Amino acid sequence: MYHQLILLALIGTIMANVIPFSLSNISEEYKEFIPEEVRNFYKGLTAEDKEILRDLASKHATFANEDAALEALKDKSDKLYKNAVELRNFVKAKIDSLKPDAKAFVDEVIARARSLRSDDGQKFDTDKIKQAARDIIAKYQALNEETKEELKVTFPPIAKIISNEKLKRVASTFLQKN
């Protein structure tokens, strides 16, 4: 179960940079697990900003890469673009600070999280998410203890999630259902 929580924490932290969403859809008791920088980004969004993000998310399959998506964002809102780049740079700096094994693991989690997004940008396939979680858990379990500790230190929300009993139960239940 410990490994499931690490996976969910990593995916949650990373997907905040990958997938536009509204913090209003998240229960207050879980918001504390979202990095402050991510919360601040979403708190500062106007209704127009959210609409721009939804529009771009629905077209995500048309962008060759993250830079192309950011350029499209810049065309729609320079302010939103600057805020998104700031958030991206924050996450990138954390990832770049990792040693090679930890960085490779996080890069793989990011790639897997991005692959879970549907072409229309709307719905997730729960079975694919569960399989991705199982695959990443297996890869996490294969990491050495030093790498696991580095991930916890670099991404503090992970440590919070690991110690939360309610989230442990939720993660276990989610991954057991078929």
Swiss-Prot record:
Matching InterPro entries:
Gp-FAR-1
User: What does the UniProt keyword field contain?
Assistant: Coiled coil, Lipid-binding, Retinol-binding, Secreted, Signal, Vitamin A
Coiled coil start-end: 67-89, 129-154
User: Which range is the signal sequence, renumbered to this chain?
Assistant: 1-16
Output a single Gene Ontology CC term carried by this record: extracellular region
| Maturation and modification | Not glycosylated.
What GO MF terms are annotated? fatty acid binding; retinal binding; retinol binding
- Where's it found, cell-wise? Secreted
Q: What does this protein do?
A: Binds retinol and different fatty acids.
State the name under which the record lists this protein: Fatty-acid and retinol-binding protein 1
Question: Which source organism?
Answer: Loa loa
